[in-house]
């Protein structure tokens, strides 16, 4: 099942499964994020979104 999240304002969204899969996406107003991951959390800044992701699942510098 594909879940979706539609941005109402510019934001960063953490999509995750509460276990070991976390994705951070930047969305603008009206843009939609579709994912197989069941949970979406919205944050105002990338730093706040990154803080939500457990340390062991955060991207390293080469992935940014």
Give the location of each predicted region.
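Short N-terminal "domain-start" leader segments
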Residues: 1-33
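A short, charged, amphipathic alpha-helix used as a generic interaction element across diverse proteins
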Residues: 29-64
């Amino acid at each position: 099942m594909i879940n979706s999240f539609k941005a109402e304002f510019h934001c960063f969204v953490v999509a995750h499964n509460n276990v070991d899969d976390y994705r951070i996406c930047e969305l603008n107003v009206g843009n939609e994020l579709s994912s197989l991951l069941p949970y979406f959390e919205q944050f105002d800044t990338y730093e706040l979104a990154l803080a939500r992701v457990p340390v062991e699942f955060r991207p390293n510098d080469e992935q940014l």
